[in-house]
Amino acid sequence: NKELAISMGVEEFESLRNKIGEDLIVTDGTTLLGADDKAGIAEILTMAEIILKENRPHGNIRIAFTPDEEVGRGPDHFDVEKFHADFAYTVDGGEVDSVDYENFNAADANIQIQGLSIHPGSAKGKMINALHVAMEFHSMLPVNQNPAYTEGYEGFNHLCDLHGECEHAVMSYIIRNHDEQLFEKQKEDFRRIADYLNQKYPKDTIRLEIKDSYANMRSIIEKDMRVVDLVKKSMKDIGIHPSSHAIRGGTDGARLTYQGLPCPNLGTGGYNFHGKYEYASIQEMEKSVELLLKIVENNLS
């Protein structure tokens, strides 16, 4: 977008180095694209269209689209028994050469802070500024667990929202880690800080609520890797060198896996999700469709 001086290059987005010669779908730079996950929907429906038009042989295929995946509520009302499948895949990732079955353990933390508002002219020894307490709470969390400093298998505590005034403030965090023990330690850090501040200030200054969202599906999938092996064989059959990565996020498949439906995640050819630099490669989207068709074919044998 020349008017707004918005552009993207390989210096900031390394994935572009591998997209030379490909056709990219982008935005005007003022909004996200929505390839996450309209790309996956398009690929699944294109697969179904080809199977029906060409009358290709196939086993029983179940297709479902879940709303609210981005807020972690996609499987809330998903009926696994009614879906009636032995295994499944979410088509919700990035690189098409990746089949991912390892994701974050996830929790949400909500912190209510009750302050005491006094006229600042006579506040000495009396005022408790809830916003100051919020900043104090945040400063006591490990600095190296700020998401801006993490990568790979490193977990993080992300402050998503802070609002309020002197009398009352609210903080919202997401807590993430692939390792279950480290994940539990991060949650314990929140409880320990809340206990400390409730001793420093009047009781119930801090009210902390932590809710688990989803868990790492790796331990379940690794008990029976056939669902992954099928994808890797299909990738090789169409000339893709398969890879697997630890997802620095979550998918509906993680919760579905724990509900008895093994569900790794496949790539869509979309990149830079959740921001105005999001884009999708048409060639990778076409390759994703080819992969889905090959999975259907190989599953028959």
Tell me the role of every PLM-derived stretch.
Residues 53, 128-147, 181-193, 229, ...:
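His/Asp/Glu-rich mid-to-C-terminal helical/loop segments that flank catalytic regions of hydrolases
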Residues 1-60, 287:
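Active-site metal-coordination/substrate-binding segment of hydrolases
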Residues 49-71, 151-152:
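Short helix-loop-beta-strand segments that form the rim/entrance of peptidase-like active sites
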Residues 36-43, 130-133, 227, 252, ...:
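Catalytic-loop motifs flanking and including active-site residues across diverse enzymes
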Residues 132-149, 156-158, 205, 215-263:
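Active-site-adjacent substrate-binding region
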Residues 26-35, 240-245, 275-276:
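Short pre-catalytic strand/loop immediately N-terminal to key active-site residues, enriched for Gly-Thr
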Residues 7-17, 21-35, 67-195, 204-206, ...:
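Midchain, well-structured core segments that form catalytic/ion-binding scaffolds
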